Amino acid sequence: MTLLALGINHKTAPVSLRERVTFSPDTLDQALDSLLAQPMVQGGVVLSTCNRTELYLSVEEQDNLQEALIRWLCDYHNLNEDDLRNSLYWHQDNDAVSHLMRVASGLDSLVLGEPQILGQVKKAFADSQKGHLNASALERMFQKSFSVAKRVRTETDIGASAVSVAFAACTLARQIFESLSTVTVLLVGAGETIELVARHLREHKVQKMIIANRTRERAQALADEVGAEVISLSDIDARLQDADIIISSTASPLPIIGKGMVERALKSRRNQPMLLVDIAVPRDVEPEVGKLANAYLYSVDDLQSIISHNLAQRQAAAVEAETIVEQEASEFMAWLRAQGASETIREYRSQSEQIRDELTTKALSALQQGGDAQAILQDLAWKLTNRLIHAPTKSLQQAARDGDDERLNILRDSLGLE
């Protein structure tokens, strides 16, 4: 059994590729079923966010394993293998464990130390438990990563400053508009990222917020908290002209805001500028919008320059966190190796007990037939000894014949011989 982590993220692939490799919530179960149908896959977890798509797998080793999994991923998303191969990373066993721990701790995020990723990893794990996990080692790896993430956040200052994609989006808005108190902001979506954006905006005295979402109930709860108006996604076209700032983050597989929609809004606004911040993957705003005069479109990748200014104080904490991850990953792999030994021990004990029961049954039968008790017991002891030492004796003899002193010493040590 081998543990694997493979995928792409914001460091290896542009948003144009990442949006083609995402797994939407609506198709996740189907994807997991398809993944587990692969003969080499024992269990799997799919993590798909705006910045990464990753598969965490427990697999049986086989020839061309990497090729088979890349082919599955490309076939599922109708991708050319060459388009994906150069952006794909592949981690195995200890490296896979370390990678997951780093991801869960925010050490591999676009925003170093951001806390939202832990919730996303936990959700991915929970989704996989609906009949798709099927591997105790994989489950233990995820549970361990959660405790490591908690330890990193508790024992280091990795989360000391309020830095996130949501924070960066608000920072961008404050850089472009002198005061946010007089602008109208349209938020598209009502997920965790938009919740954070809404709270940041409220802290910066935004008076007018509109939340557009597919389900009104979720949006209404957030609107009640931040004092916003709620509209449906179908109302965006009519209300876009009211917004000075649009920040969008949904799980829609297709763009929600098109070039024509923005053109109409700009005309109604008499070309008063609009800021559009698209932090969704796949993108919510058609890229062509960025070519329009007075429409200033930023994607999640464009936020990197803003985010980089807020990282300095987290670098020292990241070094401490990496040490914790290295230690915890090493301990996990030691536990995993011990599980392999435990199975061997169980098999050896079962084999020995089977020999014991077989010979004891024969001895009891002989006693019941009136045989000499002392002779029967001596015969039992002799046969039991010979049967139990038969396999170790053959291994010792073979090691001696091969001149394999290292193996001979290991066998002597295993048998308790000085």
Swiss-Prot record:
Keywords: NADP, Oxidoreductase, Porphyrin biosynthesis
MF-aspect GO terms: glutamyl-tRNA reductase activity; NADP binding
Site (Important for activity): 99
Gene3D superfamilies, alphabetized: Glutamyl-tRNA reductase, N-terminal domain, NAD(P)-binding Rossmann-like Domain
InterPro entries linked: 4pyrrol_synth_GluRdtase, 4pyrrol_synth_GluRdtase_dimer, 4pyrrol_synth_GluRdtase_N, GluRdtase_CS, GluRdtase_dimer_dom_sf, GluRdtase_N_sf, NAD(P)-bd_dom_sf, Shikm_DH/Glu-tRNA_Rdtase
Miscellaneous remark of the record: During catalysis, the active site Cys acts as a nucleophile attacking the alpha-carbonyl group of tRNA-bound glutamate with the formation of a thioester intermediate between enzyme and glutamate, and the concomitant release of tRNA(Glu). The thioester intermediate is finally reduced by direct hydride transfer from NADPH, to form the product GSA.
Comment text on domains: Possesses an unusual extended V-shaped dimeric structure with each monomer consisting of three distinct domains arranged along a curved 'spinal' alpha-helix. The N-terminal catalytic domain specifically recognizes the glutamate moiety of the substrate. The second domain is the NADPH-binding domain, and the third C-terminal domain is responsible for dimerization.
Name under which the protein is recorded: Glutamyl-tRNA reductase
Gene: hemA
